[in-house]
Amino acid sequence: MLAQLFEQLFQSIDSTLITNIFIWAVIFVFLSAWWCDKKNIHSKFREYAPTLMGALGILGTFIGIIIGLLNFNTESIDTSIPVLLGGLKTAFITSIVGMFFAILFNGMDAFFFANKRSALAENNPESVTPEHIYHELKEQNQTLTKLVSGINGDSEGSLIAQIKLLRTEISDSSQAQLANHTHFSNKLWEQLEQFADLMAKGATEQIIDALRQVIIDFNENLTEQFGENFKALDASVKKLVEWQGNYKTQIEQMSEQYQQSVESLVETKTAVAGIWEECKEIPLAMSELREVLQVNQHQISELSRHLETFVAIRDKATTVLPEIQNKMAEVGELLKSGAANVSASLEQTSQQILLNADSMRVALDEGTEGFRQSVTQTQQAFASMAHDVSNSSETLTSTLGETITEMKQSGEEFLKSLESHSKELHRNMEQNTTNVIDMFSKTGEKINHQLSSNADNMFDSIQTSFDKAGAGLTSQVRESIEKFALSINEQLHAFEQATEREMNREMQSLGNALLSISKGFVGNYEKLIKDYQIVMGQLQALISANKHRG
């Protein structure tokens, strides 16, 4: 029963599969045994591994033979021979692999791991016996005996003998080295002394020769250079003296020109004061005009009083007609004389205003011309000053040029401002005067026309006409005079402020320019004096040094 079961099992198994299984089994056993041998573990398995691999090889051999024999059929030899050969192939391969790995493992164990196991066994015996202790003590005794004989022995190879020899050699070597060092030091000192003598001698001679040549060249160059330098210095000192004289002259000229500028500014101030005095006469003329207007107002009041009388007379006209006619004649004469007086007063007032305007225009023209002349003189003085100073220094020329340009521009601006203010004042005065004259003329003509046209019906409209004429004349004259006075006062105030502002600005700019010029002169003079002192100090030092050498 079991035999048939095994036969069926082996007949169904492929020989190649059995071969691979046994080969992998042998390889696994080999690697496991090698790992245990390397780590020194599982010693029993390590010892049994070669036998196990051989047994697996033999087992594979018999299984291969059985597979070949069981599948061999005598009736069909052709088909049975390949199966038989496959079983034999499995038998031989498994046996060869098993024996090969067993032999390989035994060889590796003998060559690589046996010595290691022996050393470990000696170092770590499983049990220590008295024999081991005796053996160790005996070895230690032998070692100590050899050590003592090596230290205290009489032979030359002992340690004490070697130390004695070494000490003798060290003493001899130190004495020889000391002798050599002494000899070398003496010889080196002699060579250094010889070298120092040679160096001192050669260096002294070369230094003396070099100094002699340098002194000769220095004396020659000093004679040549200082002759020319003294000549140039003499000429420079002469030019400096001449420049100082010219500078003094220019300073005096600048002082004179500055004085002329101050005088011209004083004259300008006087002219402006004259203009101011002339302008002060305008309120006086206005006061006279006020008196004339008061006279006219008085005449108008007289006319009103006469008109009131005429009203009273008109009430009595029915009874006293002849008296009315006589009174009318008297009133007509009075009206004619009043109109004539008003016309004469208006003409006189207009003439006075024209005269005052002409005198004011003349005064303004004269003041403007005087101020223009003074500014022109100032410009000419500063122009000549700039021309003189430009010959002495380029820096001074540029400074004065800028100053003169600024003063010229400011002077021109002041002249333009003064001329514009004067023209505007003159134009306003002429316009106001013309307006007043026209207004007075028109008013007078209107009054005369009204008087002449209303003479026939004066009993009806003379009171109304004279009231309107008086009120219109009074208001217009008052408004015109007030406007004229305000305009004159504003223009005079503006003219005064502009003049004062321009004068202050011009004087300030002039003072700043003169101050900068003076500072420039002082700085240049101080710099020149310092340079002169430096040159003289250097020259004196060179002369004293030359004297000491001589």
Swiss-Prot record:
Transmembrane residue ranges? 16-36, 52-72, 92-112
Tell me which InterPro entries the record gives.
MotA_ExbB_proton_chnl, ZorA-like_t2
Q: Does the keyword S-adenosyl-L-methionine apply?
A: no
**Domain of life of the native organism:** Bacteria
Which Gene Ontology cellular component annotation is one that this UniProt entry carries?
plasma membrane
Return the Pfam families for the record.
MotA_ExbB
Kindly list the biological process annotations in GO that this record carries.
Answer: defense response to virus
Asked if Transport is a keyword of the record, the answer is no
The main place the protein resides is: membrane
Subcellular location(s) of the protein: Cell inner membrane
Q: Would you identify the family this protein belongs to, as annotated?
A: Belongs to the MotA family.
What is the official name of this protein in its record?
Answer: Zorya protein ZorA
Q: What is the lineage of its organism?
A: Bacteria, Pseudomonadati, Pseudomonadota, Gammaproteobacteria, Enterobacterales
